Amino acid sequence: MAIDENKQKALAAALGQIEKQFGKGSIMRLGEDRSMDVETISTGSLSLDIALGAGGLPMGRIVEIYGPESSGKTTLTLQVIAAAQREGKTCAFIDAEHALDPIYAKKLGVDIDNLLCSQPDTGEQALEICDALTRSGAVDVIIVDSVAALTPKAEIEGEIGDSHMGLAARMMSQAMRKLAGNLKNANTLLIFINQIRMKIGVMFGNPETTTGGNALKFYASVRLDIRRIGAIKEGDVVVGSETRVKVVKNKIAAPFKQAEFQILYGEGININGELIDLGVKHKLIEKAGAWYSYNGEKIGQGKANSCNYLKENPKVAAELDKKLRDMLLSGTGELSVATTAEDADDNMETSEEF
């Protein structure tokens, strides 16, 4: 419907005044002068990138990754850092838990010499460091490990046993309001790792909750629930974990999809195993008995040998990765079924007052 001439002039004057006062680009029509595609960074897992719908985690947004202990939360974020650094991006790790292992990070492909790291004393200090790094415009990815370890200054200076009801939730709420706009302007990805707690007295539904109040749940564009669902063994020796990640919330694509992959101890996500599995599923790799073939050429007998072939031939692995991404992210293939609506409800109506 056309706007009459007087209204158009009034609107143009208002837009001009806004841009003069707040800067060019402070207001615009949704379809003009901006890319509708969201820039993303790979998670290090092909199946998770596809489940996210956009090929990775979105830049300029807040992401929350939560799960039980030893489920792979820190490993996943270190893989994100490694992927970002390979693209020449600058990354920072806010180690509130004081538990980052640089040797393990290096094994996962992280360039520890160029990784900014901080071990803050208080939650307020950690969040102020995040804000300062964001406002610099020079940092592309920031990891906070973890929300549960962001202890308010008043709690640290008080005595054990003192009641500090709602302090952490209030601190996180203030930080989210301040950080959200700065992250968008700087195009910085901020990932919060979070822990799980149990709500007392829940008779029906999921008793699990995450720490830090409700603000993070609202401000996060993506929320990932990561779980260890089994062990990978070589004989009697456990060498890794079977891992499932559910996309509980997604503002950039359809939510409630899930991905399964292997995390190998000392190596990280088994990307070559994912390439083999997805390649066979989508008929890019042929399987005859125990033999796997790609482009008519045998690449290995058994999955382990085929993974070794891809590891020794990164060009072949990169070609297969590109074909799978083009096929599955364009919608010509399907990765995994969405969880049911009932699962989605169970999978985190989370609140927290710790």
Curated annotation (Swiss-Prot):
Please name the Pfam families in this protein's record. Answer: RecA, RecA_C
Keyword terms of this UniProt record: ATP-binding, Cytoplasm, DNA damage, DNA recombination, DNA repair, DNA-binding, Nucleotide-binding, SOS response
Q: Which SMART domains match?
A: AAA (SM00382)
Q: List positions binding ATP.
A: G67, P68, E69, S70, S71, G72, K73, T74
Q: Which InterPro entries match?
A: AAA+_ATPase, DNA_recomb/repair_RecA, DNA_recomb/repair_RecA_CS, P-loop_NTPase, RecA-like_C, RecA-like_N, RecA_ATP-bd, RecA_C_sf
| Principal subcellular localization | cytoplasm
- Highest taxon above the source species: Bacteria
GO biological process, any: SOS response
GO MF annotations, alphabetized: ATP binding; ATP hydrolysis activity; ATP-dependent DNA damage sensor activity; damaged DNA binding; single-stranded DNA binding
What are its GO cellular component terms? cytosol
Give the record's family classification: Belongs to the RecA family.
What this chain does, per the record?
A: Can catalyze the hydrolysis of ATP in the presence of single-stranded DNA, the ATP-dependent uptake of single-stranded DNA by duplex DNA, and the ATP-dependent hybridization of homologous single-stranded DNAs. It interacts with LexA causing its activation and leading to its autocatalytic cleavage.
Its name, as the record gives it, is Protein RecA
Species this chain originates from: Enterobacter agglomerans (Erwinia herbicola)
> Which gene is transcribed and translated to give this protein?
recA
